[in-house]
Amino acid sequence: MKEKNDVQRAVTALLDELAPERVLKRAERLPVPVEQYRTPSGCVLQAATAALSVSWFPDPTADAPLGELHVIVWRGVVSRRGAPPRREPATVTGELVLLPVEHPSDASVWRAGDGTTYDTDSLAARCLALLAEQMAADPAAGPVK
């Protein structure tokens, strides 16, 4: 049980790093090159022509007893829940599936399929780099902030 709680804290820390919870404000927000959206189980970073989604699947499976984290890179605009479908749906250009490290001996709490391990900061940086790479493939997307 303690490990599941530790993993949930790591997920929350990653989501807070990538897309902090919004505070209600009276003024209208100005558009930025990358919009950040939180979902109940993840977040979406949306640029003009590229996006990155992070989704946490906490239910245990035989291969992932502590759950799985999916990082997906998209070309286009990802439809948000409740929004009408887009004429041109976004397409997946890359995916990274990570598992929590059981009993980590250091700060690394995530392991990719290729064995690469990440702590929260390095995984957030990797996510932003993946989004920047996809945005660079379409210069109209603008820089990652």
Task: Label every model-predicted segment.
Residues 79-145:
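Ampiphathic alpha-helical segments that act as solvent-exposed interaction surfaces
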